[in-house]
């Protein structure tokens, strides 16, 4: 007896969206269901090699499609892994890997763009409801006895019950809406398969009725004959020699592989022979995948052994900083029954990974030769590329060459260009870390370097706080934070004479008394336009904020205060009353902290003194 179940809230939202909103490119429903069938065949192909109870299974993978114009139905069937009752509940009734939540959060309101997101978010099955008022799924899991039927009209609930099905696999029948009945046509289905699923690695067969006429005049008779033909080529495109492939072949395969409606930016097709034999086909997308910065991101690379699918969920096939790459690795040397544990320690795969990484970085270097193309690439993938600096020491120098930065003088500069622009007086490549570029550009400390004609890299990506201190140097030139003592020493600031130092001692003492344990020292300076500058050895407010967000204890670094005695404010403060000096110290220190992106510890005191100053000025 069938039992009723409620969809999760997000699934109900998604179904409503599919039925009422995402009607642009409705034809993708077939692409998605064929893709799911292909995945089911991939999984069973692998299990027949690795799972004892399935090794004797007779299995010739295929996808069958049939239709009935009168009944307005389309049926898609595969003989893959199949589903049992629990699988149906998990895959068809609730959210898997937060895919649906992510999908819903990414919707833009543009129907064409939103339709294009369907496959990328793993919610493709529900696209059936774009054209069907009723969907019936009958499935039998390989190695199990019972078969189950899943039925829904897309209205918030579904039913599951036992059914009769002889062989393993899944059959999905769509009962089409009146306005979508035209999809139940041989030519419609063939056209969609050629457009979206030509390069699916398994044969797709279409059953149809062909009419023939015999006789003449009144004796003319229509003879209907049931026929079946294979629609796709079912070839592993990556195994076809490059000379035999056209750009359109690569682009069509990319669409099948990635479910991305945009064309790829570049592709790299490599066949390696010798001690190791393998083929790789990698794509660099135009747009970043939605989960690029998620911990549970989906790997974009599929691993095959001798054309047998092994996994699409191994994040070690490429370094994490190349997780935007889509593609295929097909090895001739790995054992077919390779396990996930073996994969992680396998020398063959490690060699393939190393060579593939170099190939991809080389192609990115080629993109960088065209500034317009590289700006497009870097806007999408620049942040994630920086991660390679702390994880891929072998390719660190190549990655450094690929990075681009905003600086005080330029909006888009490489380290090579920065170095070439350095004057003879400049000893280091200088950078400054902060939460946003506007704050960095207004930082008082930056003025000191600008006055000397030194350019400064302005770094506001969170990843910068982690990787830049680790870089050390570029082409034998050290990289230094402008907050460091070494960088400040390179400014060559004129020393303060003894008479001036003595004249300002009361003011220095007043600042020390007012700020107490919040500072390490007060010094005099004569460079820059700002009245006060904070100096912290290895100051990194971004890193401090990151550590605080992660619940880690932030090591306290007390700043050195530099008072700019060329600023008219200090000429007046030098003879001011003690209460005025205290008030000025608190306000100037607080303002400097805000400018550098640090947190005010004594915000209440700052606010009190600010209000007091405003009252005095009125």
Swiss-Prot record:
Keywords associated with the record: ATP-binding, Chaperone, Cytoplasm, Nucleotide-binding, Stress response
Function: Molecular chaperone. Has ATPase activity.
Family statement: Belongs to the heat shock protein 90 family.
InterPro entries assigned: HATPase_C_sf (IPR036890), Heat_shock_protein_90_CS (IPR019805), HSP90_C (IPR037196), Hsp90_fam (IPR001404), Hsp90_N (IPR020575), Ribosomal_Su5_D2-typ_SF (IPR020568)
Region (C) residue spans: 546-618
Protein name (Swiss-Prot/TrEMBL): Chaperone protein HtpG
PANTHER family registered for this protein in UniProt: HEAT SHOCK PROTEIN 90 FAMILY MEMBER (PTHR11528)
SMART domains tied to this protein: HATPase_c
Assembly with partners or alone: Homodimer.
Gene Ontology cellular component annotations, sorted alphabetically: cytoplasm
Compartments where located: Cytoplasm
Any Pfam family: HATPase_c_3
Lineage: Bacteria, Pseudomonadati, Campylobacterota, Epsilonproteobacteria, Campylobacterales
Example GO molecular function: ATP binding
Encoding gene, per UniProt annotation: htpG
Region listing for A, in residue ranges: 1-340
Chain intervals for the UniProt region annotation (B): 341-545
């Amino acid at each position: 007896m069938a039992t009723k179940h409620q969809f999760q809230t997000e699934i109900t939202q998604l179904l409503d969206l599919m039925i009422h909103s995402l009607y642009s490119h409705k034809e993708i429903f077939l692409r998605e269901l064929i893709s799911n069938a292909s995945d089911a065949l991939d999984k069973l192909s692998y299990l027949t090699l690795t799972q004892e109870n399935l090794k004797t299974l007779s299995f010739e993978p295929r996808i069958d499609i049939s239709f009935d114009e009168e009944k307005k139905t389309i049926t898609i069937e595969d003989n893959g892994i199949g589903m049992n009752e629990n699988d149906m509940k998990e895959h068809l009734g609730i959210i898997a890997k937060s895919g649906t939540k992510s999908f819903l959060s990414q919707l833009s309101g543009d129907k064409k763009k939103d339709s294009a997101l369907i496959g990328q978010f793993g919610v493709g099955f529900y696209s059936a409801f774009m054209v069907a008022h009723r969907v019936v799924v009958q499935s039998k899991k390989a190695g199990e006895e019972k078969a189950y039927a899943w039925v829904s009209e897309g209205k918030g609930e579904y039913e599951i019950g036992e059914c009769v099905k002889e062989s393993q696999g899944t059959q999905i029948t769509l009962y089409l809406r009146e306005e979508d009945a035209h999809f139940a046509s041989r030519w419609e289905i063939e056209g969609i398969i050629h457009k979206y699923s030509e390069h699916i690695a398994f044969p797709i067969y279409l059953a149809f009725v062909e009419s023939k006429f015999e006789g003449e005049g009144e004796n003319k008779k229509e003879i209907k004959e049931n026929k079946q033909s294979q629609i796709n080529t079912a070839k592993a495109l990556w195994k076809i020699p490059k000379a035999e492939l056209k750009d359109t072949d690569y682009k069509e395969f990319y669409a099948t592989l990635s479910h991305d409606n945009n064309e790829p930016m570049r592709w790299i097709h490599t066949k390696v022979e010798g001690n190791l034999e393998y083929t790789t086909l990698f794509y660099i997308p135009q747009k970043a995948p939605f989960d690029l910065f998620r911990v549970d991101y989906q790997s974009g690379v599929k691993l095959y052994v001798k054309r047998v699918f092994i996994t699409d969920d191994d994040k070690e096939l490429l370094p994490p900083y190349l997780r935007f790459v889509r593609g295929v690795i097909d090895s001739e040397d790995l054992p077919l029954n390779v396990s996930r544990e073996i994969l992680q320690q396998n020398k063959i795969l490690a060699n393939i990974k190393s060579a593939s990484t170099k190939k991809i970085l080389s192609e990115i270097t080629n993109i960088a030769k065209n500034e317009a193309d590289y700006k497009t690439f870097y806007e999408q993938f620049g942040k994630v590329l920086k991660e390679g600096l702390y994880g891929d020491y072998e390719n660190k120098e190549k990655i450094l060459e690929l990075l681009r930065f905003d600086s005080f003088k330029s909006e888009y500069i490489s380290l090579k260009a920065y170095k070439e622009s350095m004057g003879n007086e400049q000893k280091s490549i200088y950078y400054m870390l902060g939460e946003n570029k506007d704050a960095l550009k207004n930082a008082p400390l930056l003025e000191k370097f600008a006055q000397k004609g030194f350019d400064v890299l302005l770094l506001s990506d969170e990843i910068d706080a982690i990787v830049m201190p680790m870089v050390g140097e570029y082409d034998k030139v050290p990289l230094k934070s402008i907050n460091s003592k070494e960088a400040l020493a390179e400014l060559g600031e004129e020393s303060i004479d003894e008479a001036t130092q003595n004249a300002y001692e009361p003011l220095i003492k007043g600042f020390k008394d007012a700020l107490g344990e919040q500072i390490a020292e007060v010094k005099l300076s004569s460079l820059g336009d700002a009245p006060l500058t904070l100096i912290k050895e290895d100051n990194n407010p971004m890193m401090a904020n990151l550590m605080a967000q992660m619940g880690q204890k932030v090591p306290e670094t007390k700043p050195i205060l530099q008072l700019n005695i060329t600023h008219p404010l200090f000429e007046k403060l030098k003879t001011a009353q003690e209460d005025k000096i205290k008030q000025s110290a608190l306000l100037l220190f607080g303002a400097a902290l805000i400018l550098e992106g640090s947190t005010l510890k004594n915000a209440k005191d700052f606010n009190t003194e600010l209000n007091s100053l405003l009252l005095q000025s009125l």
